[in-house]
Each structure stands twice: as C-alpha cells, then as structure tokens.
Amino acid sequence: MSEDKIGWHGTTILSVRRNGRVVIAGDGQVSMGNTVMKPNARKVRRLGDGSVIGGFAGATADAFTLFERLEAKLERHNGQLLRAAVELAKDWRTDKYLRNLEALMIVADDQVTLVLTGNGDVLEPVGGIAAIGSGGNFALSAARALVDYEEDAEVIARKALAVAADICVFTNDQVTIETLESRV
C-alpha cells in the first residue's frame, strides 16, 4: 500500500508500552491538501468496554468503520484483542467493501499492542513502541531514543509527538492520550 493510498498525510499516532502502562497518543491536525481543516481532532479513543485503546491514521470515516468492526469482534471474542484483530484483518483483506477502506490502526490492551493494516497485517511492535502516520517515523525514532532516559510511557509519548510536530508539517502539538495499566 502506498502512502498516498492510505492517506498518511495528516496525522501521527504513537503507542508506548513501558513499566506497567500502555499509552496511545495522537496529534489533532486534520489536513486537506496543504490546508489545516481542524487542529483538534480526536484520533485516539477507548473501544468496547474501555479495556482496549486505539488510534488511527487515514480516512476518518474508514477508521470509524474499522473501529466499529473491531468492537464487534471484541464482543464476539470476549475481549481477546489479538483474536479480534486477526478476525478483523481477515475481513479487511477479503471483504469487497472493507478492502477499499483507507486507514491504519494501532490498538492495545493490557497485554499486547498491535498495528493493523489493510493488507491484512497484524503486527506486534518490537520493544513496545509503534507509530503510524505522516509523522510516525519521527515519533518512533524519538520514542526509541527516549526509552533509555525516561521511565514514564506518557512522558515519552508526549515528548516524541512534540518532536514529530516540530518536523512534520502534517502533525501538530495538540495531543490526545489514552492510557491503560499493562500486565506486560
């Protein structure tokens, strides 16, 4: 999938799992071409009964469709995120309608963090850090550097998103964060 097809231009989502906490953070900027349409969008949220958090990059309507589908899968599989994510990825890859949705997601529960793509990928990040979106590589690099010096997952996420916002013109500094206590 090319960056143009999935609409990466316009957001940064970062997940950090550290010292018994998992955080997913996202900036608030929504861009259309080279125009900022909204500076304070909420691209990070709790799913289902609140035991799963997620963030998205890509087309907003597509992401909400995928969040709804994931919530249904979570309910069907008794809150088992990995199983629900694999089932969603199968549907996303094979369903004629879902296959055309243009979004990426990072989701996490108290045990696992996953990156979900429209290619059918369900990826567990190495080191408990994952990022997607136009500023994702900047945030990922900053977070990986910060884990050697900072213990708190939320502080790492905020600082890493600040770095991404300083570099990526499609990322701003209006950050939304969701946090869960982690077993890992």
From Swiss-Prot:
The active site is at T11. It comes from the Bacteria. It catalyses: ATP-dependent cleavage of peptide bonds with broad specificity. Na(+) binds at A165, C168, T171. Its EC number is 3.4.25.2. Keywords: Allosteric enzyme, Cytoplasm, Hydrolase, Metal-binding, Protease, Sodium, Threonine protease. It is found in: Cytoplasm. The keyword Hydrolase applies. Allosterically activated by HslU binding. GO terms for molecular function: metal ion binding; threonine-type endopeptidase activity. GO terms for biological process: proteolysis involved in protein catabolic process. It is an enzyme of class 3 (hydrolase). GO terms for cellular component: HslUV protease complex; proteasome core complex. Gene3D superfamilies: Glutamine Phosphoribosylpyrophosphate, subunit 1, domain 1. Its main location: cytoplasm. NCBIfam families: ATP_dep_HslV, PRK05456.1. HAMAP family: HslV (MF_00248). Belongs to the peptidase T1B family. HslV subfamily. A double ring-shaped homohexamer of HslV is capped on each side by a ring-shaped HslU homohexamer. The assembly of the HslU/HslV complex is dependent on binding of ATP. Protease subunit of a proteasome-like degradation complex believed to be a general protein degrading machinery. This is ATP-dependent protease subunit HslV.
